[in-house]
């Protein structure tokens, strides 16, 4: 698994680890994921060395909560947020809020981010929540074939507005899983890759964006 390899090889080189969502394929509540314990244990072990573990929920794991954070030794942050990255003000986001061409997705996103909807979901049994999550994932995968790549990508003008409002010249996001560095008019937009780009031969193919003091960010593929 690419994430495990990353945690054992690249992450220990840096004092902070920031995950911008979609660490898990789905998350139906902190009480319902025993299969996630190996990943949580890796994060906890990383945090125990004195390094910071910072997690922003994504669209797949929007319901990550306080119990997860305690178990993983992590800090949960809101989306979006301005952070100081090696002395540079940076806008961090999952990125799906800027995929405005996909109107149906934006309606679904608004629903899943509603605290009332989340509270209602948590009142259901684990089995009911799991069935709902699997149905949503299946529908999402089915609809991908009906949408163009442009429809599923960010709207650059929306990103530009967010960058201007935040007063930054650098934005880092995920969601689209199209790792690249975009040099726009007046700002840089860096896109992180998916964790699950493992090749058919089992070779982990993923990456991360890394920072060093005084240097430009870099996309490290591994």
For the regions a protein language model found, what residue spans apply to each?
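Charged/polar, solvent-exposed surface patches and flexible loops
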Residues: 5, 41, 45, 66, ...
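Glycine-rich loops and low-complexity Gly/Arg-rich segments
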Residues: 8-12, 41-45, 79-82, 101-103, ...
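Short C-terminal domain-edge/linker segments immediately following a structured domain
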Residues: 12-18, 47-51, 85-88, 120-127, ...
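A broad, low-specificity signal for short, low-complexity segments enriched in glycine/proline
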Residues: 16-17, 38-39, 49-57, 130-135, ...
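Core catalytic region of metal-dependent phosphoesterases/phosphodiesterases
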Residues: 1-85
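Conserved beta-sheet core of the metallophosphoesterase superfamily
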Residues: 71-78, 89-91, 96, 101-108, ...
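Active-site-proximal loop/helix segment associated with metal-binding centers of metalloenzymes
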Residues: 95-155
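Short low-complexity stretches enriched in small and charged residues
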Residues: 9-12, 44-52, 94, 125-129, ...
């Amino acid at each position: 698994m690419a994430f495990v390899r990353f945690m054992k090889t690249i992450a220990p080189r840096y004092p902070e680890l920031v995950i911008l969502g979609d660490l898990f394929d789905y998350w139906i509540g902190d009480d319902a994921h025993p299969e996630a314990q190996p990943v949580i244990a890796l994060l906890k072990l990383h945090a125990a060395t004195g390094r910071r573990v910072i997690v922003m929920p994504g669209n797949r794991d929007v319901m990550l909560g306080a119990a997860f954070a305690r178990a993983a030794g992590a800090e949960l942050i809101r989306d979006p947020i301005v952070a100081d990255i090696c002395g540079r003000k940076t806008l961090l986001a999952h990125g799906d809020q800027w995929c405005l061409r996909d109107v149906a997705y934006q309606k679904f996103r608004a629903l899943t981010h509603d605290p009332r909807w989340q509270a209602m979901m948590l009142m259901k049994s684990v089995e009911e929540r799991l069935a709902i999550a699997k149905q949503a994932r299946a529908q999402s995968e089915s609809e991908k074939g009906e949408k163009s790549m442009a429809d599923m990508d960010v709207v650059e003008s929306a990103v530009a507005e967010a960058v201007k409002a935040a007063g930054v010249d650098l934005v880092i996001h995920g969601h689209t899983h199209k790792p690249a560095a975009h040099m726009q008019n007046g700002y840089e937009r860096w896109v992180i890759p998916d964790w699950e780009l493992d090749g058919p031969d089992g070779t982990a193919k993923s990456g991360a964006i890394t920072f060093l003091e005084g240097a430009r960010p870099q996309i490290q593929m591994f």
